[in-house]
Amino acid sequence: MRFPKKYEHFDNREERAAFIAETFEKEISQSSSVLDVGCDYNTLKKIVGSKVTGIDLYGDPDYKVDFEKEKLLRFKDGEFDFVVCTEVLEHLENFHEIIDELIRVSNRYILISLPNCMDIFTRLNILFRGKAGKFYGLPFEKPADRHRWFFSHTDIERFFQHYASRHELSIARRFLHCNFSHTWRGNLVRACVKFFNLDSAAQSYWILIEKN
């Protein structure tokens, strides 16, 4: 099975928020309320506007929320038309509980992205350097942040196919994101990935779930 792919490059949260606003413009424009889970400095709100409510433990959110302790209990069932949670769940021990909460507070759409922790570049790094990246391993001091989960894009796909079926949800869109820089090296890798259609080269998996 080959996944559709997107190749837009972003270096930071601001560029990722712009990618979200552009890629999901139709769904966001149809929504009167948006919840950004893990908003950091509310960058999506700065782009989309006041209909976005940002929550996070750090940064400059509208509400400070510790997802490990409070979950999303301050919000009502179906309170938001569009719920965004990108590059957050892999940091949480209560992964499954938070997904249930994302579904609960959404009235229609839920956008989730997760890293493809087993992309080909990580595998090569482990093979030749013995390192899996900054969010893994055994640092000398207790880290402020780390990934609690290690999964591939196929693991994520199987999980959401099962989850959607069990909860009578629809998968509206999903794609793999290949985030390569615009340097000559990045352009070369991008060209090779496109030519060979390599799913394993993607750095993240994105899925838009719709409630029936």
What is each model feature region?
Residues 21-122, 206-211:
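Conserved SAM-binding loop
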Residues 1-27:
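Conserved class I S-adenosyl-L-methionine
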Residues 11-17, 35, 43-46, 71, ...:
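A broad, low-specificity signal for short, low-complexity segments enriched in glycine/proline
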Residues 6-11, 15, 93-212:
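S-adenosyl-L-methionine-dependent methyltransferase catalytic module, highlighting the catalytic core
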